[in-house]
């Protein structure tokens, strides 16, 4: 839009030891692209609880991965349910906030203007659609996404953000209101190992015992806990909380 204030929370996608000030986005140019497209659309609304879930998409890669991945899963499941080519439907998501709360909208619409009404026709069998979507997301053994579950040549441009496990977390929240459980201690150890050598260069030693992980510097020692990116960041004295998504996909944010 024309409001420059929307850029104030957009940070540099990298860290520099020479530049300490925030980016002012003074050279940005507003460009609006769009066209009228009349078609049928199905929208699924997921209400989020900001007390439990980090609802800020600019800093939470989980929210973007979960929304995009669940949208792709719903499209593939809908095409199987309707026995049509997946090119007949287009999918996407948006995160919105208003006085009523925070929401993720997953939408499906026909790829052709004034199409055959596929997107709306699936509304009558929404329960079967969600069940089939769950089967698709749970029926794979990959770590995030592959060509056996969510990836195909039409969505190559978003392959890097597809994550069937994040999609399952969002689907579980929508159906039961349950958050993903805490990261098991063994997995926390595994994820933190990727930072061990980097931290040693800065003079920080990672101490792992049977119950917890500690980061020890020259002047202080703090407990380190890896938490699910879906969660609102916990707060606890003398404890550093690190998102598991940052350790997997964006280590520079974890440091």
Roles of regions detected by a PLM:
Residues 101, 219-221, 253:
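Elongated scaffolding segments in large macromolecular assemblies
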Residues 194-238:
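Active-site metal-binding core of divalent-cation-utilizing nuclease and nuclease-like domains
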Residues 83, 200-203, 254:
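Short, flexible coil/linker elements and helix-boundary hinge sites characteristic
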Residues 1-198:
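Extended, highly charged accessory segments
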Residues 237-255:
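Basic, glycine-rich
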């Amino acid at each position: 839009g024309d409001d420059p204030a929307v850029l104030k929370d957009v940070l540099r996608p990298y860290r520099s030891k020479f530049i300490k000030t925030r980016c002012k986005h003074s050279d940005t140019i507003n460009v609006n692209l769009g066209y009228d497209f009349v078609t049928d659309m199905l929208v699924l609304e997921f209400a989020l609880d900001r007390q439990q879930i980090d609802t800020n998409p600019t800093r939470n890669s989980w929210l973007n991965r979960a929304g995009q991945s669940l949208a792709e899963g719903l499209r593939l499941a809908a095409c199987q349910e309707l026995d049509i080519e997946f090119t007949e439907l287009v999918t996407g998501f948006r995160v919105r906030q208003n006085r009523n709360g925070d929401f993720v909208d997953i939408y499906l619409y026909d790829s052709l203007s004034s199409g055959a009404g596929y997107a709306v026709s699936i509304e009558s069998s929404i329960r079967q659609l969600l069940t089939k979507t769950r089967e698709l997301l749970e029926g794979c053994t990959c770590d995030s996404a592959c060509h056996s579950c969510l990836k195909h040549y039409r969505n190559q441009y978003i392959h890097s953000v597809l994550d069937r496990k994040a999609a399952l977390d969002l689907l579980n929240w929508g159906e039961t209101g349950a958050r993903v459980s805490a990261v098991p201690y063994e997995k926390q150890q595994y994820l933190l190992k990727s930072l061990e050598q980097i931290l040693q260069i800065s003079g920080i030693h990672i101490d792992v015992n049977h119950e917890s992980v500690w980061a020890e510097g020259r002047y202080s020692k703090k407990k380190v806990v890896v938490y699910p990116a879906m969660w609102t960041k916990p707060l606890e004295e003398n404890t550093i909380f690190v998102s598991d998504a940052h350790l997997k996909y964006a280590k520079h944010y974890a440091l």
